[in-house]
Amino acid sequence: MSGCNCGSSCNCGDSCKCNKRSSGLSYSEVETKETVILGVGPAKIQFEGAEMSFASKEGGCKCGDNCTCDPCNCK
């Protein structure tokens, strides 16, 4: 069971922990490249691919405002 109720009353189930860390959440981070160009002028630093995401065990049910699913796409 996904813990998410889809339909007209789309909301997350009991396992929803909006804005809180819980054991039901996993953290993933994408590798980041940093390019530093040095020379006569000031240093320029550029970051590429600085992305972070949180994934839950609720089968695609992401918590939005007021602990509702955003978007409601439960599997």
Swiss-Prot record:
Keyword match Metal-binding: yes
Keyword rRNA processing: no
UniProt xrefs under InterPro entries: Metalthion_15p
One Pfam match: Metallothio_2
UniProt keyword list: Metal-binding, Metal-thiolate cluster
Example of a GO MF term: metal ion binding
Function, as annotated: Metallothioneins have a high content of cysteine residues that bind various heavy metals.
UniProt-listed PANTHER family: METALLOTHIONEIN-LIKE PROTEIN, METALLOTHIONEIN-LIKE PROTEIN 2A
Family, as annotated: Belongs to the metallothionein superfamily. Type 15 family.
Name the record gives this protein: Metallothionein-like protein 1B
